[in-house]
Amino acid sequence: MDWGMKNRLARIIRPKTGRTLMFAVDHGYFMGPTSGLEKLDETVKPLLPYADSLMLTRGALRYYVTAETDVPIILRVSGGTSILNKQLLHEGITVSMEDALRLNVSAVAFSIMVGAEYERDTLLAFTQTVDKAERYGIPTLAVTA
């Protein structure tokens, strides 16, 4: 593991305890407006001091999190359909590693649908994401659903 990967992981996982408290607010990308998260900036900001990292989508990061935020960002890079489509679990890559780098994220997150109809598709897209992220020293988090 290279220095960049170690450094990014050390931002997310407390080196002294090996633990982390991740605040995930990426639900709106497929669930639509989520009760309590309609005003994401107002909801998230007071909770940031208690979080070791914040997982969210590219749009939420750009529009609701200030650049002065020092909480490590885990960027959701998978998606596809919304609750309006019966193929909700058919996800793919939605954000490039170049965008992740431009946004200065500490890690990326990708949903894999274990046991679902599209399990193979999500696993293959996940491995592509891992390969691309490793080129830049960016950790990849598998989110199981």
For each feature predicted by the language model, list its residue ranges.
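Short beta-strand segments at enzyme active-site cores
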Residues: 56-57, 106-112, 138-145
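Expand to "…catalyze enediolate/carbanion chemistry for C-C bond making/breaking, isomerization
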Residues: 6, 133, 140
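Non-catalytic positions within long, well-ordered alpha-helices that form the structural scaffold/packing
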Residues: 47-48, 101, 134
